Amino acid sequence: MKNILLCTDGSDFAQQSYPYAAWLASKLGGNIKVLYVTDIRAQKAVESVNLSGSIGLGTSEELLKQLVDLEHTKAKLNHQKAKLVLATAKNTLQQAGIESVQVMHKTGFLLDCLEDLKGDFDVIILGKRGETAKFAQGHLGANMERIIRSIPKPCLVTPKQFQTITKVLFAYDGSASCQKILQFLAGSSLLADLPLHIVTVGKTNQDPQAIANLGTAEKVLEKAGFKLEVELLVGHAEEAIVRYQEDNAIDLLLMGAHGHSRIRHLVIGSTTAQVLRKTSIPVLTFR
């Protein structure tokens, strides 16, 4: 995870992702690229306007010219905003001690840009919600869900308030995405110095598959030298995981974006999406 891509739109949520990016880069000795994407949809909408059928030809041409001029002005303002947001992010990261920071401004769709860049980064960081957060409280950012579903890289989803990471929780279900997390933890020094809690959610406290899953994870991570707390939870997965996180003052949650059994693939209403909605800590997902 040496190459970190930090997505920002300048919102409150995005700005709180900067210290998490700095923490990750400092722990890994990594570099950060900061990406700001100007949405192309508004520009395309004006280019496709045809007013000739609704008002007089001369009037429509004049109005369309005014609309185009307005869009040019908006484009300049968007460019200035992007420069300001990126400069603020770079300054914040450098003040936090990160020397290797690059900034990028692209126009288009965020997901398309990430697809183009996915060979250039190892992990992506973005806020749980973006600029429209105050208008859709309780919802996840639309970009965030699509990114987790589509980009085959770990994704750190950050909350509105930064807090120092001192304890980590791994929600393990034995799925392929959780196996990736297990391999990452065993082979990385990122979280090796922090207490690690492992939980899985079973149908009962005697669930044989859940017990086997916990045993597998515990064996691998004990061998890797982690100080572990292991717990079998019972109930609705998302509620049990969030309750455990709150009761044990966990600062970082790791879970698979796609799972099976009690932790299912990421769709609206799934365990991963529900946990992301309900928790107030950063969540590192693996696909």
UniProtKB/Swiss-Prot annotation:
Superkingdom of the source?
Bacteria
Q: Which family is this sequence assigned to?
A: Belongs to the universal stress protein A family.
What is the protein name for this chain?
Answer: Universal stress protein Slr1230
Which species does the entry assign this protein to?
Synechocystis sp. (strain ATCC 27184 / PCC 6803 / Kazusa)
Taxonomy of the source species: Bacteria, Bacillati, Cyanobacteriota, Cyanophyceae, Synechococcales
